[in-house]
Amino acid sequence: MTDLAPLRRALLSVSDKTGLVALGKALAARGVELLSTGGTARALRDAGLEVKDVAEVTGFPEMMDGRVKTLHPAVHGGLLALRDNDDHLAAMQEHGIAGIDLVVVNLYPFEQTVAKGAQYDEVIENIDIGGPAMIRSAAKNHGFVSVVVDVEDYDVLIAQLEAYDGHTTYALRQRLAQTAYARTAAYDTAVSTWMAAQVGEPPRRRSFGGTLAQTLRYGENPHQDAAFYLDGSNSPGVATARQLQGKELSYNNINDTDAAFELVSEFDQGDGPACAIIKHANPCGVARAETLTEAYRRAFDCDRTSAFGGIIALNQPLDGATAEEISSIFTEVVIAPGADAEAQEVFAKKKNLRLLTTDGLADPTAPGLAIRQVSGGYLVQDRDTGRLSADALQIVTKRAPSDQEMADLMFAWTVAKHVKSNAIIYVKDGATVGVGAGQMSRVDSTRIAARKAQDMAEAMGLPAPLTQGSVVASDAFFPFADGLITAAEAGATALIQPGGSMRDDEVIAAADEAGLAMVFTGMRHFRH
């Protein structure tokens, strides 16, 4: 190993040609011999650069539709040979192997091929073999060899060659090697994850990979370090959103914004405007209305106190009128499919407010994984993509819900899916009026939601509690009748819950006695 290693010979083989020609010219200007393959070689030659085909080095042509190009001792010997080991140098001389001091590789676009929904055979052909092999060989020998797998490192390499007269430092080579191993690990993770989906059963080993998007100021609390990584998904959401203005997103901003956007994406744009306001990953107000402004107002009226400093998600592009309403209180983040010029002009006066646009909504039915770390391991499950139609509900009481009650029950059930358990949601006319979240007993969630609704009615000067004439959703069954009775006392007229308790008969009897309509979903929406 040496600190300064000369760079005399480089092998370039990339799928993403971004910055390739500029890098090639910078290397050639320093007298570096360029080796390459296929399309990369053509791109360099088209730019007027002298390039030697790898086939000239190996003595073998590319074969098997390009599957075999660089898998040869003339390549890997040139990468792996220790430059300060006499035996290695003798072997190189004996077999006519010349050293390769730099490998520039970015891999076949496997992740992008999967993301676009390609057929099985196309996905298989986009599993890179030679690229990862060269990356790993070069990275292992980083004492002498540089390996670049990220376009963003091209300028770093060029700057170092200029600063050290055609040499690289050990510190840079070591960092590049770490980046390289992280890339091959993430690549293999993507392939393994896709293969596991084809097999259809949990794999014996599972890895998770991502690309650093942002080093955060801190995590949930100031004493915790944190960073934000991307998994390569192109689905609309906080990870792919465009930030139009405002301060850098924090750890908690990202977490809450994701929760808000996932919730509001449950409501199709074609079914009308919807708004969700989130605090600490729980909704403090959700509503639908004829206009986006009215949807925001109704969501805000559910819990005006908690909405302060919250995250707002919209299912339609933000307009100027809604932006004016939102600007009246302190808001951390607004995320929407878009924002018109008037809305952006309004928010420009609020320099710290973060505005994100997504160019669409997330697909709540898209398959995926939910991952949680526990001491010594991970819990992995499918995303909760469960959805129900009114036709799938079981009416279990003497009275059936009215059409309006049924519409509100379906709305409440959708919201309950996104509330921390134990979750109780009061809804009236397409808007939440009370949310009980995260309590250890279901009856406490029922009481808290009703109490908050009553407090809000008093603050707004209304003559009756907001829960009067509402419906209630429970994310899991009522283990006793007390929660249902509490909801009835608060003025609820109908309930939706999974059912399945050993005391279902008691709960149904209590509903009938109170004149409530109740439906069972047969589906639970625990959220922890």
UniProtKB/Swiss-Prot annotation:
UniProt-listed InterPro entries: AICAR_Tfase_dup_dom_sf (IPR024051), Cytidine_deaminase-like (IPR016193), MGS-like_dom (IPR011607), MGS-like_dom_sf (IPR036914), PurH-like (IPR002695)
The MGS-like domain, residue ranges: 2-149
UniProt similarity note: Belongs to the PurH family.
Entry note about domains: The IMP cyclohydrolase activity resides in the N-terminal region.
Keyword Transferase among UniProt keywords: yes
Source taxonomy: Bacteria, Pseudomonadati, Pseudomonadota, Alphaproteobacteria, Rhodobacterales
Transmembrane region(s): none
Any Gene Ontology CC annotation: cytosol
Any single Pfam family the record assigns to this protein: MGS
Protein name: Bifunctional purine biosynthesis protein PurH
Keyword set, alphabetical order: Hydrolase, Multifunctional enzyme, Purine biosynthesis, Transferase
Stored PANTHER family: BIFUNCTIONAL PURINE BIOSYNTHESIS PROTEIN ATIC (PTHR11692:SF0), BIFUNCTIONAL PURINE BIOSYNTHESIS PROTEIN PURH (PTHR11692)
GO BP terms, alphabetized: 'de novo' IMP biosynthetic process
Pathway in which the depicted protein is active: Purine metabolism; IMP biosynthesis via de novo pathway; 5-formamido-1-(5-phospho-D-ribosyl)imidazole-4-carboxamide from 5-amino-1-(5-phospho-D-ribosyl)imidazole-4-carboxamide (10-formyl THF route): step 1/1; Purine metabolism; IMP biosynthesis via de novo pathway; IMP from 5-formamido-1-(5-phospho-D-ribosyl)imidazole-4-carboxamide: step 1/1
Family annotation (HAMAP family): PurH
Disulfide bonds: none
Reaction it catalyzes: (6R)-10-formyltetrahydrofolate + 5-amino-1-(5-phospho-beta-D-ribosyl)imidazole-4-carboxamide = 5-formamido-1-(5-phospho-D-ribosyl)imidazole-4-carboxamide + (6S)-5,6,7,8-tetrahydrofolate; IMP + H2O = 5-formamido-1-(5-phospho-D-ribosyl)imidazole-4-carboxamide
Domain of life: Bacteria
EC number: 2.1.2.3, 3.5.4.10
